[in-house]
Amino acid sequence: MVREKVTVSTRTLKWKCVESRTDSKRLYYGRFILSPLMKGQADTIGIAMRRALLGEIEGTCITRVKSEKVPHEYSTIMGIQESVHEILMNLKEIVLRSNLYGTSDASICVKGPGYVTAQDIILPPYVEIVDNTQHIASLTETIDFCIGLQIKRNRGYLIKTPHNFQDGSYPIDAVFMPVRNANHSIHSYGNGNEKQEILFLEIWTNGSLTPKEALHEASRNLIDLFIPFLHIEEDNLYLQDNQHTVPLSPFTFHDKLAKLIKNKKKIALKSIFIDQSELPSRIYNCLKMSNIYTLLDLLNNSQEDLMKIEHFRSEDVKQILGILEKYFVIDLAKNEF
């Protein structure tokens, strides 16, 4: 455990870690201070940071299990001590660390008797397990325990619904949040009109991120949310002449974008954010990492520019075009790129 004496700066606003410890492989703790703040600022920042820490940071989880030999979720399998439901609950608790975008596949194939733990999961190279000792199942007989897994990176919760069930496939209620808990408190000091505040922020994580990494990512996400407000132009905030659609000719992708850009003054392109257009999370994350936040940002990039984005594919460009057609009510010819 690392703990530092709290010293209050009277000059530059600054974050500082004053306590850090690792309680287990799946429980990290960090305590930070931000000072000096004017009266009222600490609560504003503390509330925003807590919400960003708990709701805006992405995590990686097992979201589905595939096995054709299992009749239903609450069945038991000969030679396995746990029920299928208990195995699903154990898989739900597996903590993963990754740079994954979207979904990926993994698997387990173990011959009994013996214990199946997290270290038996065969993962893609860009995904790793935080705690290899996490228990999955106990094999009591000489049987082959082979299942497929679906891994996904997302944020918040993923609640299984009836339409998510498929033959031989069982969804898991996934909790993507790497931050287990976050609290903030405020200490005031000074006299009269000179009162200032110190913000104390406590962060607990599941080990896939350190509290310091979580704080950095939450801060980055908050900054990204506010950046568009720095570029607002008054003349682009509202639709003009009741123009709700943009007619485009069936040209190439580049020509379509050029046509939209030419007509951009007729629509509030800067007030339409890409997260409003139902883009898949992988495409959205790629665009966000390239500082593309609004429809105007998107239309200022050519097809060649988009293809230079890391992890971007031609299919993604087609999907973006489909979104443009949907939201601008455009009837375009389907050209091959």
From Swiss-Prot:
GO terms for cellular component: chloroplast; DNA-directed RNA polymerase complex; mitochondrion. It catalyses: RNA(n) + a ribonucleoside 5'-triphosphate = RNA(n+1) + diphosphate. It is found in: Plastid, Chloroplast. Its EC number is 2.7.7.6. One of its GO terms (biological process) is DNA-templated transcription. Residues 1-233 are annotated as: Alpha N-terminal domain (alpha-NTD). It is an enzyme of class 2 (transferase). The keyword Nucleotidyltransferase applies. InterPro entries: DNA-dir_RNA_pol_insert, DNA-dir_RNA_pol_RpoA/D/Rpb3, DNA-dir_RpoA, RBP11-like, RNAP_asu_C, RNApol_insert_sf. Pfam families: RNA_pol_A_bac, RNA_pol_A_CTD, RNA_pol_L. GO terms for molecular function: DNA binding; DNA-directed RNA polymerase activity; protein dimerization activity. Keywords: Chloroplast, DNA-directed RNA polymerase, Nucleotidyltransferase, Plastid, Transcription, Transferase. Residues 265-337 are annotated as: Alpha C-terminal domain (alpha-CTD). Belongs to the RNA polymerase alpha chain family. DNA-dependent RNA polymerase catalyzes the transcription of DNA into RNA using the four ribonucleoside triphosphates as substrates. In plastids the minimal PEP RNA polymerase catalytic core is composed of four subunits: alpha, beta, beta', and beta''. When a (nuclear-encoded) sigma factor is associated with the core the holoenzyme is formed, which can initiate transcription. The N-terminal domain is essential for RNAP assembly and basal transcription, whereas the C-terminal domain is involved in interaction with transcriptional regulators and with upstream promoter elements. This is DNA-directed RNA polymerase subunit alpha. The gene is rpoA.
